[in-house]
Amino acid sequence: MQINDTFLDLNNYNRLVIPTTNTHLLLAGRTGSGKTRATLFLIAKSILQNPDADFYFADFKNGSDYQFAINTGHLTDMQAAIDDACYALSSRQAGVPDRYPYVVILDEYPSFILNLDSKMKKEYQSKLATLLNLGRSFEIHVWVITQRPGAELFANGSRDNFNCRIVMGSPSPETRRMMFGDDISEVPADWLNNNVGQGLIYRDGIGISHIAVPKINWQKLNTFGRLQEIT
């Protein structure tokens, strides 16, 4: 089953094909930029196009964005989400034949990290770095949702392992550099002033595109809860 709507390329009004497997995703944006809309759209699209995928959600701000996952056993705290993903990685490295996509979505991971003491901070930065460095080979994928994607929050240069990066709204020059590096210098100036639900996406091997995000069809997203009841 396919979702008809995808991100719209504002440069040529073509539909973009967003990678739904073998992807580590970093999604950034200020409050009110459309970051949540983009996140939920990608979740809905991925769930419907990858029915065998196993999704887990952690929201440090404990908001209502992931209400569709309540009572499914797939909405957990940030620490447990990272620990469980690391356990899944270790199991697959040891030969457990699970090869379905395992996707862990960490909303406001930086706030979680900054709330830890020094020892725990290093431990969980290291765990996330391991997932980012090794996970894709074992069908384990990390999505990090944040307002500010500072490199200091990701150990050992692991931020570079995000092969799909999205910035919603009109990001600051600092955020643009953090997300896109030197590639941002090639972006037209009018791509940097965006309305709610508009932004930039970088995909490995493709580069940067100017995008708009469709509004969420909650009926499609709520399919997640029904799928979990069946399985």
Where are these regions (language model features)?
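P-loop NTPase catalytic phosphate-binding loop
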Residues: 1-103, 110-171, 212, 219-231
